């Protein structure tokens, strides 16, 4: 899928790979970095008789870097994947846009850091919300549709070479039927792979039971699960 594309680009161009996995409520500290307060307090306690000890705690040795700062300061050319940016709020998106546009990050009490390599940035979105126009204007848009049945079978087999052909084929076809339903979250290719792996582990002798018992690896909400069981699994299998 989209994540794999970013990894392949990094590998093909011999670049280091960094990833920011966005989610609802993600903060600047989780993207850029944060002060190690415990280490700062320990240093203050150990050096409480020194007059300038407070200034010393605002150095890089007391700062925990997160993916964005690591990608910026990496000496080797890199690829940064900002995965599912639509899950982050607009404030975080604006910050990322500014940092990447200006090629620098400013951290209070620590200073400004310049981009140190030729960084390729890849954003992925599942359209949970519309991205800012400024973000769209600065990106090359690429839509990646779900693969065909035949292609998805090939992908699953490449990930799970030990899986039975019949199991792979059945589950991939079921997933394609599921994607035609109006669901809150349709199963991803990763979900298909996980479902095949789970059914194979549970055993294919009672395929229908294994399929239903492991449905949660591909279907991620209770309402979607009920819909899939009612309209596809119980009706057709």
Provide a role label for each language-model segment.
Residues 1-237:
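C-terminal regulatory/interaction module of P-loop NTP-utilizing enzymes
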